[in-house]
C-alpha cells in the first residue's frame, strides 16, 4: 500500500542539480564550466540590462538633453460648450462640481471651457479658463462666463 511518506516524483520527472566546482573528478571542477577569464567567468556575473554597452558611454548619455519639466505648469480638463448645451437645462449655473457630477471631469481638476459645438441655451458658466471662441459663444447665447481661481 502506498503511504504519504513513500510518495516520490515519477522517474525522469526531475533532474539532478549540477554541482559545479567540486574537483576534477566531477567533470565540472576547476573553472566550473565558465571557461577562462573574461567578464562571464567572474563572480557576480549577471545578465546585463539592455542599455548597458560594455562600459562605453551609453547612447542616452551621448545624446544632448532637451527641454525641461515646468514645475508651475497648470493642466486643464477641456469641456466643450456643445457638450454643456446637450447635458444641461437652460438657465443653469455650471461649475466644476456640476460638471464632475455628470462625469465630465474630476472635482479636483482645473476646467477649461472650449468653443467646439453650438450653444443655444443661456448659462452662467464658472471655470478656471475659457477659450476666446467659448467666451464669444456664451455671450452670443445670452449667458455669462466667470473665471474662478
UniProtKB/Swiss-Prot annotation:
Basic residues: which segments have biased composition? 31-40
**A cellular component annotation (GO) from this entry:** cytosolic large ribosomal subunit
Q: Which UniProt keywords apply?
A: Ribonucleoprotein, Ribosomal protein, RNA-binding, rRNA-binding
Q: Which InterPro entries match?
A: Ribosomal_uL15, Ribosomal_uL15/eL18, Ribosomal_uL15/eL18_sf, Ribosomal_uL15_bac-type, Ribosomal_uL15_CS
- Annotated region described as Disordered, given as residue ranges: 1-64
GO molecular function list: rRNA binding; structural constituent of ribosome
Question: Does the UniProt entry include the keyword Glycoprotein?
Answer: no
Keyword Signal: yes or no?
no
> Known Pfam families for this protein?
Ribosomal_L27A (PF00828)
Q: What SUPFAM superfamilies has UniProt attached to this entry?
A: Ribosomal proteins L15p and L18e
Residues in the signal sequence: none
Biological process (GO) annotations?
translation
Similarity annotation = Belongs to the universal ribosomal protein uL15 family.
HAMAP family xrefs: Ribosomal_uL15 (MF_01341)
Q: What does this protein do?
A: Binds to the 23S rRNA.
Subunit and interaction comment: Part of the 50S ribosomal subunit.
Protein name stated in the entry: Large ribosomal subunit protein uL15
Task: Give the species this sequence originates from.
Answer: Aquifex aeolicus (strain VF5)
What gene is this protein translated from?
A: rplO
